[in-house]
Amino acid sequence: MTIEPWYWQAIEAIDYPFPQRMHPDIDWLEREIIAWSRTHHLVQSQEQINHIRAMLLAEFVARANADLRRPVLRLIGLWTVWFFFLDDLTDTISSVESLADFHLHILSATTESITHTQEHPLISAVADLWDELRQYAGPITQVRFYRAFVQTLEAHLWEVSNRTARVQPDSATYTAMRRS
């Protein structure tokens, strides 16, 4: 994926009064994202690695989190790429019911202390992410994160079910769902 020149022209034309900030460890973050993705078998080819680089995920995360310590920056980067992989999976899933079942496996991987190496790579990866999150987040933050995580999966399932049924909700319905 490459970004078209017209995109950069539009971005450069925006008058942004704040100084641009970027975490200084963007290259390190990209290497961490790729290494973690390989470790969890989320990428197997150089083409897939190139795709991750082309998405500029590390740059996005580094720009949005310019002041964080490396471990927390890494955790945010890994969660970000994990959600991209989950979204890609929906292009190949056989049914909404299969996706709902998969979401239940994801949720169990974040609440049960068992090894998930025999399951789908996204399941073992989310278990790893949840363990890492516990190192940096207290119990209240974990509960809030989990609640937001469940809501995100619910919205994901709703959007996929709409797409599968070829339903395009109006703006008010879409906004109401995203707020609930």
Where are these regions (language model features)?
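Alpha-helical, largely C-terminal catalytic domains
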Residues: 1-180
